Amino acid sequence: VYGEGTAVLAGDALLTDAFMLAASAELRRPKDIALAIGILAHNAGSLGMVGGQMLDIDSEHRQLTEQEVYDVQSRKTVALINAACVLGVIAGGGSAKQLQAAAEFATHIGLAFQIRDDILDVIGDQSQLGKAIGADEAKNTFLRIYGIEKCKELVATLTEKAIRSLDAFEDHSYMRELAQSLVSRMM
């Protein structure tokens, strides 16, 4: 079992490993390596996952506004998904238009994923999810602000926006199916 300090050290090690992998990637152009490291730093740092976690911790004892919940989730879930999507386009030699499309896709699908996760914390089955249900009850979530029905509508709307952003890619059938699976996912 990890203690709090051990989990932080493991996270630090993973972040360092991510930068090492980005720096040693066999990309076609040196500027792609620099771009990849910049994307990773942005999505991991104070404007990304680390900053989002700090906002989340700082807000544990007060109710956040809609914008504040958006800010937290944009820096956490969305930043993680953004890094994965955009780094994939860089590694694949994608165009500037595809980089922009990947970032737009990540923004919409990241929010949809997080909102669906919040819904599943209330209506999900612990054995299917693999985590305790109701753990986020006191947390600042979109579900707390909007309720289940509005959140289901948001997941569908955000998913459709994500899918529309995929037009910059020649073959996006897999990503389209993946995005659509979020609307009804139970795990």
What are these regions (language model features)?
Residues 1-187:
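All-alpha prenyltransferase/terpene-synthase fold signal
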